[in-house]
């Protein structure tokens, strides 16, 4: 009986030819480029343009030191990857937000149909500031090959309340001050978080934005989903028509539940949000939410993962859901904090059960 490897399943799902090299890419192992080096593109995404796949991600220094920027790898078959170098570089200019020594995470690139530009959004932390900045960076390029030009960095939706906050909700949020709660995870503190304490705190300067992804809907509208409010609550932010800014329209998802690493897909009219808990570099069980509208309400479901190590998302953390037609791949990283550049990649097909609920089953 003919035995198919995991990656042959991926290739068949995406209508790609099988090759003799298919067994080189089992999930969670070393995936090499044309130079025999592990693909150093983490927390990013893949887009398909013409006959080429473009894989963007965090380029983590292989020898220690500052991050060089965002890397790009290309492939014709999703098996053989070519290192194209750095397409968004950190710079020496100390007045620039992306000066060397900053932290760039979770870069995502999408094509904007309204401008025909390729837009990159990424989580940015300023040099020497730890994770206090919690900003979004914007860059763009006329070509998927780059290079990308850095445009600006900011916190989203300054001066704007969530769309569903009525006057009474704003009053409740303003009634809480973080300095009045010395201890986290008390019932009163949790209530204050749910009622928007951190939204009110950050209203003037903009909301925090850390782990993030981009989702482009069927109508061409784009949304940025990010961990906000001290990583306690997800925000879904509508992007402007050129994808280079925020309209100010946003909602909160799962207030106080501590989600990060958001990924999003839409299948048969339902939006599915697959996330991670907040446990640093250590893996944890994936979470899942659904809604009939991007604006919610969102309902929580059990983890979509099945098989060995499902309780730790196969020892990984999601970074993107790559879609081609109605086929989806869940992309994840197995973080290696002592050498992040060597963190293995996990790509697994997403299937749907009889009720249309996503399932991610381990295959090797």
Language model regions located:
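Carbohydrate-active catalytic/glycan-binding domains of CAZyme proteins
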Residues: 20-364
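Bacterial Sec-dependent N-terminal signal peptides
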Residues: 1-21
